[in-house]
Amino acid sequence: MTSRDRRGFLQVTGGAAAAGLLGAGRAGAADARARVVLVRRREVLGADGRVNGPVIHQMLNEAVAALLGEKDAAPAWRRVVKPSDVVGVKSNVWTPLPTPPALEQAIREELERAGVRPENVAVDDRGVRSSPVFQRMTALVNVRPMRTHAWSGLGTCLKNVIMFTDNPPDYHGDSCATLGAIWQKPPVAGKVRLNVLVMLTPQFHSVGPHSFAKELTWPYYGLLVGLQPVPVDATGARILQAKRRQHFGADRPISPSPHHIEIAGSRYGLGPSDPAQIDLVRLGLAEDALV
């Protein structure tokens, strides 16, 4: 890790949390490496800001193929799921910045193309606990947009599974530091096959719960895709912190600290957050990548 990367990560996650990362990791996280794919296409957003369905579908397939080292998407998806799987697609319906329906549809189509029966695929967010498909699921695809968040610092792939819990506020303490624990409990444990962090128009700053301002988003045109949540979220955090530095003209750490990302890796073994341990594969648009 370069001195700038190290300094940037400390500013993103908060000094105390990052200090634990930069020393010996726990739960095997320190020795692990992870691949994350960043794919960006300017044409994914129209002049009106609408998502181009065929383009985002292409981006998803490019990312999944690159993630698994396949030349084509079809064999890659067949490694993500098998025909006998029952697959829940955990989306996010927060009104100002939801998971794009075109991306949800692309995921569904690829799961079915890989052999999963249509009746064994469901897309949901707040209704996952009552969904018959999610109650039977053997595999989970986790997809949500990246944004700043009043309780956890950042809305992340890690946080996206909180709706599987009996009482989400139980995990709000210490800036949602224990979100990683959810991933070790039923029905999530061992079932997440793919994490997709939507970086089309991320929100890089907010004040207060449920705060949204379009002027605090920007067209980044990207998706981050990985097998483990921590390296995906850590990469997204670096991008948002770089945007904040660019926007504010100074290093202004995300607040509250999104240290749940580092803790999920070091305490719960959900992948590395150190950029030096993340193999970032870049596809498409390179301009203003910020990472």
PLM regions and their residue ranges:
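N-terminal and secondary-structure boundary signal
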Residues: 1-291
